[in-house]
């Protein structure tokens, strides 16, 4: 079941955009300055619906700045940025966009169960009670990420990789079909990385747009359809933009860890709702 179908199991979002008619992200002649210096400039970039794109680069290359500019979290010094055809400053259909940062909020700050976290995606200020359709959407989302069996566990009892999967389930339950992840495998073991890759394999098959920022592709190397390599500041900050793998002279850093892991197995079917 596709992400928007999970959402539509309960309700239809008001004021949503027709994402199929527009690119998921569209940056035109973008520039971001930091302390008087351009992090990148004259950068144009389009991410189409259904793409699985990875922004690679070393620390300081501008990859995280680019991601935040696409989301409107970092203002452009010049140029324009759109999300599904709407200027990022006027975009309001945030149920469609899921941003999973590298550092999650402290899971132990509030004792809350996995199911409560995912169901919170369905709450609305003008409704006192959650309907059966909302509960169904939360269940389907947790099954999609293979965590329905942990639904009654506290969030802080889960591993870092499992917590990221809970955040993805939360996004699915609210109706997201565009996923942006910052270093999704940072600090989690190889098995958790593989499970996370399984989740995104299923999302890709459902037609979701996935944009991830990472030092190396690792377990995502089989899934990526496009690689964008950032290599520094200024007008030539993008060294490569195309299908994987990147040229060898650019890939030493971005890809060398990919070969340390065994090839990712075909999807196991565990993610079927």
What are these model-predicted stretches?
Residues 71:
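Helix-to-loop junction immediately C-terminal to a conserved catalytic motif
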Residues 79-92:
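Conserved ABC transporter NBD signature motif
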Residues 132-150:
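Conserved ABC ATPase "signature" region
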Residues 154-158:
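Conserved ABC ATPase signature
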Residues 179-182:
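Catalytic Walker B motif of ABC-type/P-loop ATPase nucleotide-binding domains
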Residues 214-215:
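H-loop/switch region of ABC-family ATPase nucleotide-binding domains
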Residues 233-260:
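Conserved beta-strand-loop-alpha-helix hinge in the C-terminal portion
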């Amino acid at each position: 079941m596709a992400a928007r179908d999970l959402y539509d199991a309960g309700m239809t979002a008001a004021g949503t955009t027709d994402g199929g008619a527009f690119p998921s992200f569209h940056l035109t002649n973008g520039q971001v300055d930091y302390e008087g210096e351009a992090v990148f400039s004259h950068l144009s970039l389009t991410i189409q619906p259904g793409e699985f794109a990875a922004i690679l680069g070393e620390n300081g290359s501008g990859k995280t700045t680019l991601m935040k500019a696409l989301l409107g979290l970092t203002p452009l010094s010049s140029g324009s940025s759109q999300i599904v055809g709407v200027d990022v400053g006027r975009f309001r259909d945030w149920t469609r966009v899921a941003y999973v940062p590298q550092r999650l909020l402290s899971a132990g700050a509030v004792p809350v169960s996995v199911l409560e976290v995912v169901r919170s995606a369905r709450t609305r200020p003008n409704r006192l009670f959650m309907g059966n359709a909302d509960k169904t959407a939360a269940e389907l989302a947790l099954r999609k990420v293979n965590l329905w069996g942990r639904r009654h566990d506290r969030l802080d009892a889960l591993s870092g990789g499992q917590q990221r999967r809970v955040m993805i389930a939360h996004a699915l339950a609210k109706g997201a079909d565009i996923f942006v992840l910052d270093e999704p495998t940072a600090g989690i073991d190889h098995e958790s990385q593989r499970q996370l890759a399984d989740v995104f394999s299923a999302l890709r098959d459902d037609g979701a747009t996935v944009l991830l920022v990472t030092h190396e592709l690792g377990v995502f190397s089989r899934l990526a359809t496009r690689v964008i390599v950032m290599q520094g500041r200024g007008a030539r900050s993008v060294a490569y933009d195309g299908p994987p793998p990147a040229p060898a002279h650019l890939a030493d850093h971005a890809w060398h860890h990919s070969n340390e892991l065994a090839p990712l197995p075909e999807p196991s079917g565990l993610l079927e709702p």
